[in-house]
C-alpha cells in the first residue's frame, strides 16, 4: 500500500473508490466502510483518506489516547484491501473549507469516482461539511456516493468512544468484540529491576508512547511478538 502524507497540486493516481474517516482503531464499524470501498468495482483503486492525528486531540489539546499505532493502522488497512492512503496532519486541513476539501482533495488529487463514509462523517473548517453536502457535490460531478450504516453491538453503534471506555475499565472482552480483533499495541523493551527473573518469572518491561491508550491497571493474558 502506498502512503502519502501531503497533498500536491497534481496526482498520478488512477480513478479511486475512497473510504473517508479517522479510522481510529479500525473497528468493526470502520471495517464496513473500508470493505465497501475495497469491493466497489475492479476498475477503481481502493483508497482511504484519513488524518494523522485524532481530531479531538488537535482541537481540544486533550490526550484521548490512540487505539492503534500509525504503522499498525496502515497494516490493517492494507489487510482489508486498501492500496493507497492519504494521511495528512489534521492541522494542515482543519481550516480548509468543505468545498475546497471535496474539489481539491477528493476529486482533483484522489480522482475519486466513488466515495464511502459513515452517516456522521464531518469535514472541513469548523466541521461544517456533512454527508448532505458531500452527496450533492458527488451527484453534481457524476461520482458515486454511499453512506455505510453503523454496525451495532447490543443495539448500540460500535464506536471508538465505546472501545476507549471499555479499555479504561479493563473490559478487554468488550473492547475486542467491538474492534473485531484482539486489542494490540507495541512498545520498546527496556530493562527494569530484574525482580521477575529473580523470582523465577521473567517479565518484559515495555516503554509505551504517551499517545497510546493503555488498559486499566491489572494482569492480562497476552500474545507477544518480539522483533516482528
Which residue ranges define each predicted feature?
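Active-site cores that bind ATP or allylic diphosphates and position pyrophosphate for catalysis
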Residues: 91, 99-103, 107-228
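A cross-family glycoside hydrolase active-site/sugar-binding cleft signature
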Residues: 49, 88, 118
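Short acidic-hydrophobic, aromatic-tinged amphipathic segments that line or gate anion-handling sites
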Residues: 1-9, 86
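N-terminal catalytic cores of NTP/NDP-binding nucleotidyl/phosphoryl-transfer enzymes
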Residues: 9-69
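ATP-dependent adenylation/nucleotidyltransferase module used to activate substrates
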Residues: 77-78
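Glycine/Thr-rich phosphate-binding loops of Rossmann-like dinucleotide-binding domains
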Residues: 56, 95, 125
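Glycine-rich, highly charged phosphate/nucleotide-binding loops
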Residues: 64-73, 94-102
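Residues at the starts of beta-strands that form the adenosine-phosphate
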Residues: 43-47, 83-84, 113, 144
Amino acid at each position: 500500500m502506498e502512503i502519502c502524507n501531503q497533498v500536491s497540486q497534481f496526482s498520478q493516481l488512477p480513478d479511486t473508490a475512497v473510504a473517508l474517516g479517522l479510522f481510529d482503531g479500525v473497528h468493526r464499524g470502520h471495517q464496513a466502510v473500508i470493505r465497501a470501498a475495497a469491493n466497489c468495482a475492479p476498475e477503481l483503486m481502493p483508497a482511504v483518506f484519513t488524518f494523522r492525528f485524532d481530531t479531538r486531540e488537535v482541537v481540544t489539546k486533550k490526550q484521548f489516547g490512540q487505539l492503534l499505532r500509525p504503522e499498525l493502522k496502515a497494516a490493517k488497512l492494507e489487510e482489508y484491501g486498501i492500496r493507497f492512503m492519504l494521511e495528512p496532519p489534521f492541522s494542515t486541513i482543519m481550516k480548509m473549507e468543505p468545498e475546497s476539501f471535496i474539489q481539491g482533495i477528493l476529486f482533483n488529487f484522489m480522482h475519486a469516482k466513488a466515495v464511502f463514509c459513515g452517516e456522521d462523517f464531518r469535514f472541513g473548517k469548523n466541521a461544517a461539511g456533512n454527508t448532505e453536502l458531500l452527496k450533492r457535490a458527488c451527484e453534481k460531478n457524476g461520482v458515486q456516493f454511499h453512506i455505510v450504516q453503523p454496525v451495532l453491538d447490543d443495539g448500540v453503534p460500535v464506536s471508538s468512544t465505546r472501545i476507549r471506555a471499555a479499555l479504561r475499565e479493563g473490559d478487554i472482552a468488550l473492547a475486542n468484540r467491538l474492534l473485531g480483533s484482539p486489542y494490540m499495541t507495541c512498545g520498546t523493551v527496556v530493562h527494569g529491576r530484574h525482580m521477575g527473573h529473580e523470582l523465577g518469572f521473567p517479565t518484559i518491561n515495555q516503554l509505551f508512547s504517551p499517545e497510546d491508550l493503555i488498559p486499566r491497571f491489572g494482569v492480562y493474558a497476552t500474545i507477544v511478538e518480539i522483533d516482528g
